[in-house]
Design a protein with these regions (language model features):
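Active-site-facing alpha/beta catalytic cores
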Residues: 1-81, 85-92, 96-108
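Short, basic, helix/turn surface patches
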Residues: 4-21, 141-149, 207-219, 279-281
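Generic secondary-structure signature for well-ordered alpha-helical cores
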Residues: 8, 30, 53, 80, ...
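Electropositive, surface-exposed helix/loop patches at the edges of structured domains
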Residues: 14-32, 150-153, 157-162, 166, ...
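C-terminal extensions of enzymes
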Residues: 193, 220-281
């Protein structure tokens, strides 16, 4: 699993850092860029309070930034510190898709193993609607710009893209546009049990995922949900293999923009993907 290293530093222990497969420094999130978080006291159960070092029933405020990060040198030092503390685990940096080139300059200087970019199109149960619908760069343009920047500076840092990617065709297109990997959130929740009631923040999720209510949580069958997520991922992998075959490739990582077309003139203009009306000679 990927351990998310956030400003509040919840659950940051040597054991957790070293038992993770990778560590991701969360600088930003696509659906609420530049914001922290607020967990109302009514959701802070004894279990959550113990994990977060708070009192049960006490509001938990998450800061919007790491107080120790004020320069690119600070970010580089944090990457090095986590790499050492974790025993050499891969270290990533997650940013919201905003001032991409400027932010990527800082990230590349910090020398992480991967950079995750979260574009508009993603979701979370706790982001304000007005921000979710009006901020950050749409994922397709964010990916294109990021790939161009990393190529221009000859960086070999892996690029992970997320934000609204739901099914295997989305994943295949993202890989073709230059992503090394894709990350999902909502798609996995839907595979598990989510029926998109869109009331996550209320704590009254009727399928038992986003709630601390014992009666509602009892409705969530974890083993069955885990199997559904595994099925979704396995089917997605098989479908990605099919996309590779039908385009004449041995691997999905051989896909490129040459394998894509679009009906959208703006996408064609800004991403280099050919318009469907343009002859390929």
């Amino acid at each position: 699993y990927i351990f998310e290293y956030i400003p509040n530093k919840y659950s940051v222990t040597e054991e957790n850092l070293r038992s993770s497969d990778a560590i991701e420094i969360k600088i930003g999130q696509g659906t609420k860029p530049g914001m922290g978080g607020h967990l109302p006291g009514k959701k802070v159960t004894p279990e959550i309070a113990a994990l977060r070092g708070k009192k049960p029933g006490e509001d938990v405020q998450s800061p919007s930034k790491f107080p120790e990060l004020n320069s690119r040198e600070d970010l580089k030092a944090m990457v090095a510190m986590l790499r050492e503390r974790s025993g050499g685990r891969p270290i990533g940096i997650k940013i919201a898709a905003g001032h991409l080139e400027q932010d990527l300059e800082y990230c590349v200087f910090a020398e992480p193993d991967f950079i995750t970019i979260d574009g508009r199109g993603g979701s979370t149960g706790s982001s304000p609607f007005f921000l979710r619908e009006a901020t950050t760069v749409p994922t397709i343009y964010a990916l294109s710009r990021a790939r161009k920047y990393l190529d221009a500076v000859h960086s070999d840092i892996s690029l992970v893209i997320t934000g609204g990617l739901r099914v295997s065709p989305d994943f295949a297109k993202a890989l073709a546009m230059g992503a090394d990997a894709v990350a999902i959130g909502t798609a996995a929740l839907i595979a598990a049990a989510c029926q998109q009631y869109r009331i996550c923040g209320s704590g009254l999720c009727p399928v038992g995922i986003a709630t601390q209510d014992p009666a509602l949580r009892a409705r969530f069958k974890m083993e069955a949900a885990a199997q559904r997520v595994a099925n979704f991922l396995n089917v997605s992998r098989a479908e990605l293999e099919t996309f590779a075959r039908v385009t004449g490739h041995h691997s999905v990582h051989d896909l490129s923009t040459a394998d894509l077309i679009t009906l959208n003139r703006d996408i064609a203009r800004y991403t280099g993907i050919a318009h469907a009306g343009t002859p390929k000679l």
